[in-house]
From Swiss-Prot:
Bias (Polar residues): 55-64
Domain RdRp catalytic: 286-483
Subunit annotation: Influenza RNA polymerase is composed of three subunits: PB1, PB2 and PA. Interacts (via N-terminus) with PA (via C-terminus). Interacts (via C-terminus) with PB2 (via N-terminus); this interaction is essential for transcription initiation.
Species of the source: Influenza A virus (strain A/Grey teal/Australia/2/1979 H4N4)
Primary role: RNA-dependent RNA polymerase which is responsible for replication and transcription of virus RNA segments. The transcription of viral mRNAs occurs by a unique mechanism called cap-snatching. 5' methylated caps of cellular mRNAs are cleaved after 10-13 nucleotides by PA. In turn, these short capped RNAs are used as primers by PB1 for transcription of viral mRNAs. During virus replication, PB1 initiates RNA synthesis and copy vRNA into complementary RNA (cRNA) which in turn serves as a template for the production of more vRNAs.
Gene transcribed to yield this protein: PB1
Official protein name in the record: RNA-directed RNA polymerase catalytic subunit
InterPro entries, per database record: RNA-dir_pol_NSvirus, RNA_pol_PB1_influenza
Stretch list, region Promoter-binding site: 249-256
Region called Disordered, residue ranges: 50-82
A Pfam family assignment: Flu_PB1
Length: 757
């Protein structure tokens, strides 16, 4: 039978059907190969938007730099990055006037945080450009390598573990004549295998010392490595994103801390809050505009889109903003905060892996690394790539491109939001001094603008004025991609507003299903996602019940744990049937052991083990929750774990779920093939790091774990803690005198060894 799909929507209000048009089912597109082309696009575009600026040469690195600040005022609607310093400063001043004390208070909050933040803050985050190895590494490893190199070059401020001291080292490192680093390299040689008598290739990992002169070191310190952004839906072309090195990260973190503190106090800011809190904040602004537009006034809303937000932003503008925001603060604080924008004004973009060439006969493949693009003959490239390379050549130094204007994705989300809000703030009647006025919402590069005026001409005039004001600070509202509607219907950060926010359920689709962590976590995450969507996203009871059934089905297929009385044959069915037959109370078996599903939408908040505990056979309970079970490598499990779920837009978000430790909470072991590669040295460093952290956690269990404030090292802290604990245990009779003496002796030995080192 043919079904006319439009019939499905007859009873559905149009706004609720919006989510069916979203590209969120199925796998998102991933990029393959090199991101070099996308990075060159970004660099070339950024320079094009600022082309009428002034060219200068960086005296330290020799990099050509383009400065568009205070450039010509725009004469057309093309996007441009010519922000006017005085306009930005004035916008800041008006923002402060409407929010008395906002900058002052945020500075005080930030100053406190700056003095307390530990350097381990930088271990958060995933891939980071590791300047010592000139490629990406996990953040913790990149930080450890950086500190190790600093230490071997005589920089020791970071011993105490405060981030601010590490940043002092960074600043000092930039004045050094040269830096000595250790790099990993790989040797291959052919040897005869004793067992099989065949020739095999043996790889050995070498570490070699290398000296970087001041220029080379500065280039590396200012480098952002680039990658292709993966899993972006609804786009035909991929784009490049940047990952900064350890020298830049700490400074950016403090600037963003200050900006976050300001954003929290601004009602128009969509950051840093999220979810329902964000919806409530936005609904307030809309309500204000609706109630104030009396019967005589019209109110319209623009669902806004900005052209190339971060390619038109400029670090020099951010420097001006920070200089203004911190103007009455102590000198040291102003200096710390101004370093990030200064580094960004001198940044270099690493072009990535370069290009791969294949010969026509397909026998030969060769990699052209980015370093060669400056000198290689262009006849090998196709037309579009040739144009890109020609354009970028004047900017190249050692395989990196000088990129002074523009901000690369996701670096200063909070601070750029402050800039956007400062323009929205100018829409108050006391500033527009006419009959029209505006307000709105800003979240990084996304905005919604609400304009009120007595008539249509007034609305048009208000929009024009907003558009031109934005141009003055380097924000380019796209006239093609923004659209205007009567207030009451708009979209902002993928929230659809129609007299209240409509649940855009399709956003959550990717997070339904089996996560693939382990049987225990997956069950818990699956039901939590359904529960959360019933709370937050209008997932109705009938649909939730269906989602639950589909999830259980999916789960059983993933782990091949169909019910013990099923006809389905899998590798596991023999064992599961045997278990089913031996079990008296079959309802007590977990789904992952072939048991029935007891979940319904009323009990989703209860972990499965708790739900079935009373129904379990005693010997099954004993096997399931046995910490001595040799088949399980047990983590000490907190009562709540965090899972990473992938909503459709924005970064992966962390979601809490209840974790009950059972023999199903296994942790997969690391793939051994890594041990034969050049990554091996890095892996060993990482394990060492892990061991130290675990040891530290043992001494300071989470109940008593406060961030150490003071200047003792981890070892000193652990030794003094051991002494205190030993004394308490000895005095309360928990340990004998000999044991107490032995602990004290070990502590003294450790201290002695440290002194000798």
């Amino acid at each position: 039978m043919d079904v006319n799909p439009t019939l499905l929507f007859l009873k559905v209000p149009a706004q609720n059907a919006i989510s069916t048009t979203f590209p969120y089912t199925g796998d998102p597109p991933y990029s393959h190969g090199t991101g070099t082309g996308y990075t060159m696009d970004t660099v070339n575009r950024t320079h094009q938007y600022s082309e009428k600026g002034k060219w200068t040469t960086n005296t330290e690195t020799g990099a050509p730099q383009l400065n568009p600040i205070d450039g010509p005022l725009p004469e057309d609607n093309e996007p441009s990055g010519y922000a006017q310093t005085d306009c930005v400063l004035e916008a800041m001043a008006f923002l402060e006037e409407s929010h008395p004390g906002i900058f002052e208070n945020s500075c005080l909050e930030t100053m406190e945080i700056v003095q307390q933040t530990r350097v381990d803050k930088l271990t958060q985050g995933r891939q980071t450009y590791d300047w010592t190895l000139n490629r990406n590494q996990p953040a913790a490893t990149a930080l450890a390598n950086t500190i190790e190199v600093f230490r071997s070059n005589g920089l020791t401020a970071n011993e105490s573990g405060r981030l601010i001291d590490f940043l002092k080292d960074v600043v000092e490192s930039m004045d050094k004549k040269e830096m000595e680093i250790t790099t990993h390299f790989q040797r291959k040689r052919r040897v005869r295998d004793n067992m099989t008598k065949k020739m095999v290739t043996q790889r050995t990992i070498g570490k070699k010392k290398q000296r970087l002169n001041k220029k080379s070191y500065l280039i590396r310190a200012l480098t952002l490595n680039t990658m292709t952004k993966d899993a972006e839906r609804g786009k035909l072309k991929r784009r490049a994103i940047a990952t900064p090195g350890m020298q830049i990260r700490g400074f950016v973190y403090f600037v963003e801390t200050l900006a976050r503190s300001i954003c929290e106090k601004l009602e128009q800011s969509g950051l840093p809050v999220g979810g329902n809190e964000k919806k409530a904040k936005l609904a307030n602004v809309v309500r204000k505009m609706m109630t104030n537009s009396q019967d005589t006034e019209l109110s319209f809303t623009i669902t806004g889109d900005n052209t190339k937000w971060n390619e038109n932003q400029n670090p020099r503008m951010f420097l001006a903003m920070i200089t203004y925001i911190t103007r009455n603060q102590p000198e040291w604080f102003r200096n710390v905060l101004s370093i990030a924008p200064i580094m960004f004004s001198n940044k270099m973009a690493r072009l990535g892996k370069g290009y791969m060439f294949e010969s026509k006969s397909m026998k030969l493949r060769t990699q052209i690394p980015a370093e060669m693009l400056a000198s290689i003959d262009l006849k090998y490239f196709n037309e579009s790539t040739r144009k890109k390379i020609e354009k970028i050549r004047p900017l190249l130094i050692d395989g990196t491109a000088s990129l002074s204007p523009g901000m690369m994705m996701g670096m200063f989300n909070m601070l750029s939001t402050v800039l956007g809000v400062s323009i929205l703030n100018l829409g108050q009647k006391r500033y527009t001094k006419t009959t029209y006025w505006w307000d709105g919402l800003q979240s990084s590069d996304d905005f919604a603008l609400i304009v009120n005026a007595p008539n249509h001409e007034g609305i048009q005039a208000g929009v024009d004025r907003f558009y031109r004001t934005c141009k003055l600070v380097g924000i380019n509202m796209s006239k093609k991609k923004s659209y205007i509607n009567r207030t009451g219907t708009f979209e902002f950060t993928s929230f659809f507003y129609r007299y209240g926010f409509v649940a855009n359920f399709s956003m959550e689709l990717p997070s339904f299903g089996v996560s693939g962590i382990n049987e225990s976590a997956d069950m818990s995450i699956g039901v939590t996602v359904i529960k959360n969507n019933m709370i937050n996203n209008d997932l109705g009871p009938a649909t939730a019940q269906m989602a639950l059934q589909l999830f259980i089905k999916d789960y059983r297929y993933t782990y091949r744990c169909h019910r013990g009385d099923t006809q389905i044959q899998t590798r596991r069915s023999f064992e599961l049937k045997k278990l089913w037959e031996q079990t008296r109370s079959k309802a007590g078996l977990l789904v992952s052991d072939g048991g029935p599903n007891l979940y319904n939408i009323r009990n989703l908040h209860i972990p499965e083990v708790c739900l079935k505990w009373e129904l379990m056979d005693e010997d099954y309970q004993g096997r399931l929750c046995n910490p001595l079970n040799p088949f399980v490598s047990h983590k000490e499990i907190e009562s709540v774990n965090n899972a990473v779920v992938m909503p459709a837009h924005g970064p992966a978000k962390s979601m809490e779920y209840d974790a009950v430790a059972t023999t199903h909470s296994w942790i997969p072991k690391r793939n051994r093939s890594i041990l034969n590669t050049s990554q091996r040295g890095i892996l060993e460093d990482e394990q060492m790091y892990q061991k130290c952290c675990n040891l530290f956690e043992k001494f300071f269990p989470s109940s008593s774990y406060r961030r150490p404030v003071g200047i003792s090292s981890m070892v000193e802290a652990m030794v003094s803690r051991a002494r205190i604990d030993a004394r308490i245990d000895f005095e309360s009779g928990r340990i004998k005198k000999e044991e107490f003496a032995e602990i004290m002796k070990i502590c003294s030995t450790i201290e002695e060894l440290r002194r000798q080192k």
